[in-house]
Amino acid sequence: MLRVSENGLRFLLKCHSTNVSMFNRLLSTQIKEGRSSIDDAGIIPDGTINERPNHYIEGITKGSDLDLLEKGIRKTDEMTSNFTNYMYKFHRLPPNYGSNQLITIDKELQKELDGVMSSFKAPCRFVFGYGSGVFEQAGYSKSHSKPQIDIILGVTYPSHFHSINMRQNPQHYSSLKYFGSEFVSKFQQIGAGVYFNPFANINGHDVKYGVVSMETLLKDIATWNTFYLAGRLQKPVKILKNDLRVQYWNQLNLKAAATLAKHYTLEKNNNKFDEFQFYKEITALSYAGDIRYKLGGENPDKVNNIVTKNFERFQEYYKPIYKEVVLNDSFYLPKGFTLKNTQRLLLSRISKSSALQTIKGVFTAGITKSIKYAWAKKLKSMRRS
């Protein structure tokens, strides 16, 4: 494991940012001086990529003038991928690093989500909301009841959290609560390491909340060992309580998702880049091999529905990443992953973690809630606009 001081890590990030900025300035100068001309199809012949209004882009080999800066960017990408201490405690991050993750939402919904989060007496380090209860999806009629709110609670000590929460909200738990908080926290570690309590009534809202240790959360977004939470965080989420460690590693998680999505988009579109398809590829990553799809528990059009309704949110969420990966050709994948082996590795890990989480859910939710949840998911998957 590479060890690096916080100052060293900030220097590494600053170097990367400086290289990208210099790359952009040099590219801009080249274009302004006429060393590159833009053809009618929206292509920059020196090999950079130019976004068109319809989101189609085509790339050609870069000119030699940019090689040096490209190498600098790739070198810092490589050094970053070798830093794997996901439990490292950051006191601060470079200005604006990861600020794209802090999405704003409707004030009324923000108030509701803050109310749900603050209702827990047990301490949490990181909290985010996700899913159709936070971000609307296309393909579902507005006449249906408001969807369940999904949130994830990152905690330092799961046993301590469950001990306090069981006393405050015993009705949220299945009969597993009778075995005590220590047992529940150990049971939580099965599969992806998340303990879900669905259909919890909190401040008049139907809420499904998952409890995960910070170590499990950070390990997944840094190394993709299960891809269960890393995949969720690759789609727009609403962060309700932030943690700098998550902000740092999730920025790399987004960059890795963009790296794969760009590759798959170009591969499927004869080397033409489509921004809508790019976000669909990102969204689809976490559903490959998901047992819920095999069992018909998810809408087969879910990926398209998510991106259709949230295209601008994806643009906001990935704004600096898009510039780095798509426009400047930066590349990042977690250690051990390559463009050739990623599909195989993710398929295996997602299949395993989703299957174990589904089985575990029968015990954590209880039979009645499990049937209710499965039926709700089935009905939701059958709805069409």
From Swiss-Prot:
InterPro entries: Tam41. Changing G8S: In strain: SK1. Keywords: Lipid biosynthesis, Lipid metabolism, Magnesium, Membrane, Mitochondrion, Mitochondrion inner membrane, Nucleotidyltransferase, Phospholipid biosynthesis, Phospholipid metabolism, Transferase. Optimum pH is 7-9. It catalyses: a 1,2-diacyl-sn-glycero-3-phosphate + CTP + H(+) = a CDP-1,2-diacyl-sn-glycerol + diphosphate. Changing V127A: In strain: SK1. It is an enzyme of class 2 (transferase). Belongs to the TAM41 family. Present with 195 molecules/cell in log phase SD medium. Catalyzes the formation of CDP-diacylglycerol (CDP-DAG) from phosphatidic acid (PA) in the mitochondrial inner membrane. Required for the biosynthesis of the dimeric phospholipid cardiolipin, which stabilizes supercomplexes of the mitochondrial respiratory chain in the mitochondrial inner membrane. This is Phosphatidate cytidylyltransferase, mitochondrial. The lineage of its organism: Eukaryota, Fungi, Dikarya, Ascomycota, Saccharomycotina.
